[in-house]
């Protein structure tokens, strides 16, 4: 009886690897079923962007309709199975992590004083910024007389839809 093994790809050592793992501010709450594959560690892996991802983020139409953001999240955060369902509170952390994974933790900024033209160079440590994002909790219902209001953060689909409507109204 012979045992057949899968052929090993000689380039497998060069495949993209996760560069960082992050804990989502929502803790994985507020995702519908089958929208997130949260590992037992509670942290999702984040891969660096590919050239295709960078080009996607430079395409105005894909940014306007939200599909570009979804494609980049699909590529860089494969544990997020449906990026349209991401609670808004997780988006900032995800994109900071993608930036760290792709370009490193330092974000160089250059500013110029409008009054004296003095130039200021500064580097922001994105790891510190990522660590300062608070964990959000929406579990406390609000009771008003006989009514009870339960809150949840909007998901990316809702936020993107509202932004498109706002853009259309401002265009008029």
Regions found by a protein language model. Give the residues of each.
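Long C-terminal interaction/binding lobes of large macromolecular proteins
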Residues: 1-172
């Amino acid at each position: 009886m012979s045992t057949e093994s899968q052929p090993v790809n000689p380039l497998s050592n060069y495949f993209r690897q996760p560069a960082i793992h992050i804990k989502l501010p929502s803790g994985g709450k507020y995702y519908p079923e089958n929208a997130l594959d949260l590992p037992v560690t509670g942290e999702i892996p984040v891969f660096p962007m590919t050239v295709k991802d960078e080009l996607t983020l430079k395409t105005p139409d894909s940014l306007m309709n939200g599909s570009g953001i979804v494609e980049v999240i699909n590529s860089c955060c494969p544990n997020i199975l449906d990026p349209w369902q991401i609670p808004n509170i997780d988006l900032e952390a995800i994109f900071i992590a993608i930036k760290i994974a792709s370009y490193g933790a330092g974000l160089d900024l250059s500013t110029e004083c409008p009054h004296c033209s003095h130039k200021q160079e500064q580097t922001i440590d994105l790891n510190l910024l990522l660590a300062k994002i608070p964990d959000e909790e929406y579990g406390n219902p609000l009771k008003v007389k006989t009514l009870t209001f339960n809150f949840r953060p909007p998901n990316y689909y809702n936020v993107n839809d509202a932004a498109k409507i706002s853009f259309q109204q401002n265009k008029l």
